[in-house]
Amino acid sequence: MTDRSDSCTLHLDVSGRVQGVGYREALRAEALRLGVRGWVRNRYDGSVEAVIQGPRAAVERLVVWARRGPPAARVTQLEARPDCGGFDRPYAGFERLPSA
């Protein structure tokens, strides 16, 4: 069982050249590698949105990765809105959601 006091949930908005470059799948793969749960999806405005949840250190490592993204991506802005300490909706895995 995960220690919820060490868990963190962040909502990410990522802008730049992040669609059509494998960003979502690469984020999902990195999240799974780090043991982070949540979801990722494209936005109609050209950005990518994600909710990431897991041990604080793993979530922080994923945010560092997300600021770079995969090789073909060019991240110009990443906004992370913390929801640390709250575990309103625990995620079981990491999903790719339809665009919104």
Task: Enumerate the language-model features and the residues they cover.
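Intrinsically disordered, low-complexity, mixed-charge
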Residues: 1-100
